[in-house]
Amino acid sequence: MENLVKSCAGIEKKRSNLTPSMEDILTESKERSSTSGASYESSSTTTVASSSPPPPPSQILGWPIRKASFRKNSKESVNFDHKKLTLHDDSGFKAKEMNSADVEMMKERFAKLLLGEDMSGSGKGVCTALAISNAITNLCATIFGQLWRLEPLSSEKKEMWRREMEWILSVSDHIVELTPSTQTYPDGNKFEVMTCRPRFDLFINLPALRKLDNMLLDILASFKKTEFWYVDQGIVASENDGSASFRRKIQRQEEKWWLPVPRLAPNGLTEEARTELNHKRECATQILKAAMAINSLALTEMDVPKSYLETLPKNGRSCLGDVIYRYVTSDKFSAESLLDCLDLSSEHIALDIANRVEASIYVWRRRVQTKLGVNNNTSSTTPKLTWEMVKELMAAGDKRGLLVERSETLLRCLKQRFPSLTQTSLDISKIQWNKDIGKSILESYSRALESLASNIIARIDDLLYVDDLTKQSDDNNLLSSPAVSSIIAHKKVVPLPYLISASGTPYRTSFSTTPGFSPSMISPKKGERRTPYSSKDTNKIIEKGLPSRGYGVRRVLNNYLGMESKLKICVNPSDNADTAVINQISKDVEEEKKRNSTSVHQKGPPKYTVS
């Protein structure tokens, strides 16, 4: 009868077009949960009475099942709260639409991973490890590919980076290794079972990479209130701008013309801002080193593909070339000395040498392994080796082992000189043919963080470079002003012996001291006469002295008079200071003539010192 009354009430509500309230829904759900809980308790009590309860399945199966059950419960609670929000207000419908869009995007991403980036579905796609590596690389290029300014990331890009990286890295939650362990049941029985735990390399390196990721995002987020701004290179700076004067001096970014130019106030950065920038640069440098260490470790643990070994030449000489091979096989070998002799003017040349050295390492290793394989082969078909042949093979193996060690040392020193060297051909082939998904995740994630950290360091270096130019331009503007130049040109302000030429002549304290550079480095043409002064007294001294002097005296005078010719635009030579200098030069000429007459029988040009 009660059920009939309830059904009639429901029919009346439907007729009156009334929807059930939220309280009714909650009471009905509570009643259902209480009835289901009571039935579950009754069934569990009967099972407990019959036999001793086994441990829960999450305890037996190990870490992933436990984590998955936790995720399931958390997702159910989130979905329930989300449904409650959608029933209360209209803003929940927008959130529901965004959630569905995220789900569709996640489906698309995982579909590409499963298909191996082959949308035809014909099975011609890449392996899963390479697909995940490409997904992380493409996501990094999308978010950080245009990191041209030191400014915080937009909220959309930051949310997209974290959300999609969480999707991709969720694969690593199910990469486990089985370890033997003992399980104790409540009745006291012990059983040896295999439990799951996360793989050791992922358990150690993946949380570290996530921490480095958050630190880099925090560094970018700290550039909110800054003392600098950016201007595109295509925009002409105004004349009133204090930093427009040194804009054309920035040659650091000529190769990368698309980068905006950092601009500063006329006084440059303050000491506090510059100290903070240096601190952030140091933090980014440490993050870069940590990411590079994880990346190199992941690449080292990858197997060398057979396709790379098949393309190697037969001997090490053809890999290294005659010059490097001669140095490596010599008795006295030094990697630093060899690198000093080589042309390492660009990173392209350094990368080519690194590829050659790396190829020679695996060529010599393969030769050693093949020789050892011949010695260890004891089949009846192969001829028996004599003791002399065995000794020759062992000596050849020792020699190739020494060459492998030298090549590894050379490669290590080369990478230390070029820490930002790009990946070698061996690294590229390892990434392409790798099958291990965990190593692929570590390698691609660390490489993405390497790129982000190096970009931040480069932008900070550009900013510090512009700050140095700003402060130098202020000093140059002070020296090049008309008032200062008129003061410098005045003859009573700056004496002649202490004046420095603007053409870059080496500095000297006075004319009575030894020159700052050796006269033997200068080789003027024979018979050349230089008349730097226009006064008659100077011409008479030169005409009398030059024809009868030797080669060494001419070099000394050219050294001094050459500098005086450059300084004549600043000082009037008719002054008393000029006459004193000319008299001093004439005395030096007479002394040199006397010395030249006493040293006629010397071989080669004599060496002179001016007193």
From Swiss-Prot:
Disordered: annotated segments: 1-62, 513-541, 588-611
Record key words, sorted: Guanine-nucleotide releasing factor
Identification of the protein by name: Rop guanine nucleotide exchange factor 5
Domain observations: The PRONE (plant-specific Rop nucleotide exchanger) domain is responsible for the GEF activity.
Name of the gene this protein is made from: ROPGEF5
Residue stretches of biased makeup (Basic and acidic residues): 525-541
Annotated organism of origin: Arabidopsis thaliana
Molecular functions per Gene Ontology: guanyl-nucleotide exchange factor activity
Signal peptide: none
Bias-annotated ranges (Low complexity): 34-51
Coiled coil location: none
Keyword Amino-acid biosynthesis: no
Residue ranges occupied by any PRONE domain in the UniProt entry: 93-477
Pfam families: PRONE (PF03759)
Function text: Guanine-nucleotide exchange factor (GEF) that acts as an activator of Rop (Rho of plants) GTPases by promoting the exchange of GDP for GTP.
PANTHER family for this protein: ROP GUANINE NUCLEOTIDE EXCHANGE FACTOR 1, ROP GUANINE NUCLEOTIDE EXCHANGE FACTOR 5
